[in-house]
């Protein structure tokens, strides 16, 4: 396993000198580089394309030559892809969160929920609280859409999981005779017209489903929290919410930020430096 270089910065906050973070999703994998906690690159590739994932990681390793020996950390919801990426490097070269290092976050999940919660949800929660230091609803729009609640102390309370817009469109096509196969396109934000043809009606419907669900859930969480949380969007389909005034912040690499913070937090725990 790589031995990380830890820098101590302002307010005694420790950061890894350099990190290559890999977040493996159901459909897409994000790869990011961090130098002293600052993001220096962010890209994504199909999760099935493990050769490209490995190549992109190796390219980033070369980019750090002469700077420091980077920590390489991987997490996600696609175990077979994670296994293949890990096996492409020397044993111990790639740290696997949840196995080699814990994902440390306070939560109120049940025992079953703790066992089955997706790493992507936990990492996005860690990333959101790290960035905003307040109660948040984190909306991750990908193959599925999740809307999770983190309170003002950074405690993860769980949330909701629903089909992503692509899954909705695919399901309508596959489960009916007449509805066509469509790729998601953003609807015109300046128009309040009903859908005038089947395709536009389907796009309007899935947009309303996603945006309406997030609004309903946010109101539910606000009542639970007795205060209105900040709404943060991430994920490959975050563009769904670009015209929704409810969503205050868009952070495409939120999961990578959370992965970095979780990695640093776990290493500090290993070193006995955590307060």
Residue ranges: model-predicted function:
Residues 2-39, 128, 134-156, 172, ...:
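Gly/Thr-rich phosphate-binding beta-strand-loop-beta motif of the actin/hexokinase/Hsp70
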């Amino acid at each position: 396993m790589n031995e990380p270089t830890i820098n101590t910065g302002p307010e005694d906050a420790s950061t890894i000198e350099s990190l290559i973070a890999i977040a493996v999703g159901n459909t897409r994998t994000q790869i990011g580089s961090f130098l002293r906690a600052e993001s220096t690159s962010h890209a994504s590739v199909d999760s099935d394309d493990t050769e490209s994932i490995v190549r992109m990681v190796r390219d980033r390793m070369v980019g750090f030559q002469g700077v420091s020996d980077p920590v390489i950390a991987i997490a996600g919801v696609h175990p077979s892809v994670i296994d293949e990426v890990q096996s492409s490097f020397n044993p111990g070269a790639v740290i696997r969160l949840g196995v080699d290092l814990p994902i440390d976050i306070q939560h109120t999940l049940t025992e079953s929920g703790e066992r089955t919660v997706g790493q992507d949800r936990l990492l996005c929660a860690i990333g959101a609280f790290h960035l905003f230091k307040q109660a948040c609803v984190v909306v991750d729009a990908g193959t599925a859409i999740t809307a999770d609640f983190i309170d003002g102390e950074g405690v993860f309370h769980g949330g909701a999981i629903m089909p992503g817009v692509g899954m909705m469109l695919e399901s309508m096509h596959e489960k009916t005779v007449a509805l066509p196969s469509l790729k998601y396109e953003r609807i015109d934000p300046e128009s309040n017209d009903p859908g005038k043809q089947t395709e536009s009606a389907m796009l309007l419907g899935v947009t309303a489903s996603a945006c309406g669900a997030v609004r309903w859930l946010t109101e539910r969480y606000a009542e639970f929290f007795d205060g209105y949380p900040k709404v943060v969007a991430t994920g490959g389909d975050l563009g769904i919410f670009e015209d929704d005034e409810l969503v205050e912040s868009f952070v495409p690499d939120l999961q990578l930020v959370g992965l970095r913070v979780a990695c640093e937090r776990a290493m500090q725990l290993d070193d006995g430096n955590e307060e």
